[in-house]
């Protein structure tokens, strides 16, 4: 018996909720200075209900070999990764038109 998606009610093999969620998000990438003048890359605009933030953060931390965290609606990575993070997010399935660098 097929597993049913809780969001749309379709079987998981036909479900497109994850793709629709990635298309409708507006992602903002910016540099943030935290305590002791440490810089980090803040990725905001990710919906925690539609995207698994822990998995996104894990992929990004492995790619950039840095520490980071996933909280409600944002992912924070230690260090300045603004120059390459857009290409990585496109590789994870987010549309390039919805990603904005600040």
Swiss-Prot record:
It holds the Pfam family SUI1. Keywords: Protein biosynthesis, Translation regulation. One of its GO terms (biological process) is formation of translation preinitiation complex. InterPro entries: DENR/SUI1_TIF (IPR050318), SUI1 (IPR001950), SUI1_arc (IPR022851), SUI1_arc_bac (IPR005872), SUI1_dom_sf (IPR036877). GO terms for molecular function: mRNA binding; translation initiation factor activity. Belongs to the SUI1 family. This is Protein translation factor SUI1 homolog.
